[in-house]
Regions:
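Segments that shape or occlude catalytic/ligand-binding pockets
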Residues: 169, 185-361
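C-terminal structured interaction module
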Residues: 360-370
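Preferential activation on post-signal-peptide N-terminal prodomains/segments
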Residues: 1-258
Length: 370
């Protein structure tokens, strides 16, 4: 049954203008050769060459460079175990040299799934996710795997560096030393994604970029704050749709964990003074251009009236351990559903119970009931 506390949540809601919402239609995106070409040539310095990358048949020059990096790490190692680990890995790389290719293979028709090229003085890899299974789509950009990120941002005494969002940083609060402003970095990201053919997005979060330096024993030597981690999401009529990643859904009908994935389209870019450091883009859908405007919506009052019956009917068939349900997250939002082989974003009232995680966060991504 619904708790009386839920009515307090209802009273605090700001109900948006409900006569201007639409239904928008989408197809599942196809990561075809043209898609790959557009992304690669939008990022790499094409004049310097774009090449395929094969994990099975690596390029000899890559292996030689990686061997050189690990030989230096072996020299810096402070224990026999560390040195043994590096030396064993060097031996495996030298074994791969026997069958490595002497020349890189050009991108050609972009039918491969991974490509390498340069951006300024640095090399990067772009990897694409296939949509053939209907489970993934998009791409990632990473600093070239045969190099170490420490070569991109070296620091005396450090053998490695790891960069991540300040959301996960618990060190001393210092100023962001990047000369690029947060607003300019956000615009850089939007411009890059637009060049990839991804324009219907909106920025939903921006944090500082942390660079954490370590020695060969992975002891942290120093941390610096320089750059930004920017998150964009699909924009439907100018707002980010409701795309929860709900897990541990309560049900007594199954002993297994129950979860629900809405294929959240998220585009996360790390940007510093040199530009894009990395990117992780989940580009699942593409708008068809079709749109049904000013659709009729159930009113707020009618939605609240219908809620108790809907909840009680659902849990009559799906038993729960909850004795009461207190919705603490209510919103009018766009939500994606599948209709045949197409998808549509349509306006819905969302009533959710979200519970706090160990870090105190309470969001639509936590354990919950919708």
């Amino acid at each position: 049954a619904l708790s009386s506390a839920a009515s307090d949540v209802y009273k605090r809601q700001t109900v948006p203008d409900t006569d201007k919402m639409s239904i928008l239609y989408y197809n599942q995106n196809q990561v075809d050769n043209e898609y790959k070409k557009r992304v690669c040539e939008n990022f790499f310095d094409v004049s310097a060459g774009v090449y395929t990358y094969s994990w099975e048949k690596p390029y000899k020059g890559d292996l030689e460079r990686e061997i050189e990096n690990y030989e230096e790490l072996s020299k810096q190692s402070t224990s026999d175990d560390e040195k043994s680990f590096f030396d064993d890995y060097i031996s495996s790389l030298k074994e791969q040299l026997k069958t490595a290719t002497d020349e890189r293979e050009g991108a050609g028709d972009y039918s491969a799934d991974a490509f390498v090229g340069s951006k300024g003085e640095n090399m990067y890899m772009i990897s694409f996710n296939s949509t053939e299974t209907g489970e993934s789509g998009g791409f990632s950009i990473d600093y070239y795997p045969s190099d170490q990120l420490i070569n991109y941002r070296p620091k005396e005494g450090a053998s490695s560096v790891y960069c991540y969002s300040s959301d996960y940083y618990d060190g001393e609060d210092t100023a962001n030393t990047a000369t690029v402003s947060q607003d300019d970095a956000i615009q850089q990201g939007l411009s890059f994604l637009a060049g990839c053919g991804i324009s219907d997005i909106i920025e939903t979060g921006c944090t500082d970029l942390i660079w954490e330096y370590s020695d060969t024993s992975y002891n942290t030597l120093a941390s610096e704050k320089s750059g930004y981690v920017i998150t964009y999401k699909r924009s439907v009529d100018g707002i980010a749709p409701y795309t929860p990643s709900v897990y541990n859904i309560d049900s007594l009908n199954s002993s297994d964990d129950v979860w629900y994935d809405t294929m959240d389209e998220t585009f996360e870019l790390q940007i510093d003074d040199n530009g894009i450091v990395s990117a992780y883009c989940y580009d699942y859908f593409k708008a068809t251009g079709d749109k049904k405007e000013n659709v009729d919506l159930i009113s707020w009052e009618d939605a609240v009236k219908a809620l108790p019956k809907a909840v009680n009917t659902y849990y009559a068939e799906n038993k729960t351990q909850y004795s009461s349900i207190e919705f603490n997250n209510v919103q009018l939002a766009y939500y994606k559903i599948k209709d045949g082989d197409k998808y549509e974003y349509l306006p819905v009232w969302v009533f959710a119970q979200c519970e706090k995680t160990g870090d105190g966060d309470s969001s639509q991504s936590d354990d919950g009931l919708d």
